[in-house]
Amino acid sequence: MEGDLEGRVALVTGVSRRIGIGFAIARDLLAAGARVLVHSWAPHDAEQPWGADPAGTDGVLAALGGIGPRLAHVAADFADPEAPARVVAHAVETFGALDVLVANHARSSIQDLTEVTAAELDLCWAVNARASVLLAQAYAAQHDDSRPGGRIILFTSGQHLAPMSRELPYAISKGAVQQVTLSLADALADRGITVNAVNPGPVDTGWADPELTRSVARALPAGRWGAPDDVARLVRWLASDDSAWITGQTINSEGGFRRWVM
């Protein structure tokens, strides 16, 4: 598949850690020949238990080959409703077009029904759901339909398959992405732009504690969590011409995850 995205321009959001899903996606799209704008918002990771990448943003970009003719970077907080349009505009200003949007960013939140606050509900909704729609809106407004390969790839986390009662703000906002996918796919189908969502299942990006890591691994037939590379391969295919007949789908790439045995 080397070179199958030659001439295409991609935006990948949520590229903030070298062990993260966004990093693996950006690396694979670059390897396939695309020019890529990566987005990050390091303050979010810094306030989470797993922390920001110790190498910082510069280290993440260096690991992708460094800023140059095929790689650019933008930092933005998607809690700001104007940020999605600015990020898309930056991609077009930098590379002259935008063909592939990968909305991989997320705000994580651990709050159950007794703990949940209006502020956290609003913030997760703004980042996870609203920003995904506004990114798609800005993407569609600038897209040149004469260019091949119009792709929007969103991310959910299996909320349509099982409850996540300990993570209500996250689960509710990410669960909405499945309906966003269906509706945007219909809205953009006549323009030749496909819209799909990826549910990557449990992926080891360093966030889980040892007990959860062991418990989830027992529920996966391979005996291991998914890896960022597993997700990146799927996204690379969805970004390619080979996926042109697929739209409006939420693809569950979970390695046969048996939730019921946990």
Residue ranges and their predicted role:
Residues 136, 173:
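Active-site helix of classical SDR
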Residues 220-231:
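A conserved structural motif in NAD(P)-dependent oxidoreductases
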Residues 189, 194, 246-248:
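Short, small/polar-rich loop/turn modules that mediate ligand/substrate recognition or access, typified
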Residues 104-109, 256:
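Conserved NAD(P)H cofactor-binding loop of Rossmann-fold oxidoreductase domains
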Residues 107, 114-133, 153, 177, ...:
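Catalytic Tyr-X3-Lys loop
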Residues 3-39, 43:
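Canonical Rossmann dinucleotide-binding motif of NAD(H)/NADP(H)-dependent dehydrogenases/reductases
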Residues 86-93, 111-115, 119-126, 215:
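Active-site Tyr-X3-Lys motif and surrounding loop/helix of classical short-chain dehydrogenase/reductase
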Residues 162, 214, 218-219, 236, ...:
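Short C-terminal tail/terminal secondary-structure segment
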